[in-house]
Amino acid sequence: MNIDTIRNEIAMDSSHKGINIIVEGATDAKLFEDFTDEEKCTIYQVKTRANVISLMEGLAKISKNGYTLGIVDDDQNRLMGVEVLPPNTLYTDTNDIETMIFWSAAFPKIARHLFAYEATPDDSEIKKIHRLLAERALVVGELRIVDKRKGWGLSFKDGAGKSDLEFKKFIEKRDMSYKGDDALIDAVKGHSHRLGINNDEVKLGLEEIRKEKHKPLEIVVGHDLTKVIALALKQKLGKKETRDFDREQVEVSFRLAYSLEVFKSSQLYKNINGMMAHHGIGFLL
């Protein structure tokens, strides 16, 4: 369903007295479908944050019954200090839903499901794998920020008909050690067909962002994190039944581990609940 169809459907549906939630991506849509009462809430999924924002800007000009809420991934925008959101549009707590789940009380459940342990892991073992995964995804997030600041247009995503960015080019599959900034930079430059960018200039940008001492949860992007996890599962860290998981299967595991009770501890939930209470609309299960 394209954004014009969604906009017209919401604008013309005078019988709907509940809430419409517009999200980007299938994972976000499925998560909110699991948490909401379908009689009181309609979930609309669009492909990009730009489409969510465009829809919310258009709907803000239309008088209608019911209430519409947009939810977009932060995608490092608050850290970059850019973009004012339209009315009734909220950011995720961290850069996206996946990193919200990763930095929540759901992670121990995810770790026990995905990773191989000789015995039930204690808190220190859970924290160790959490820290390792965050550190490996962090360097990619840092390079994303440098790229945004410089305007190089590097590619980190998997496009149609395009091969994946190979994380094993800068992360050692055998022990998950980091091969260094040059390996990361070369992998992303090659993936982006931007070999002319100077590595020393990129490394200066990485040094600057690291001196700023941001929290990892401000920098790490869910797409990178789930790719790192999928790579980790392919060596001794993974269980036999999860060793062949790809990024999409890891994301499903994240969603299944994230309960409504855990979601209620998030700032996003508090923001949604506050807005809905103001309008006298209850929509969660």
State each model region's role.
Residues 1-285:
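Acidic, divalent-metal-binding catalytic cores of TOPRIM
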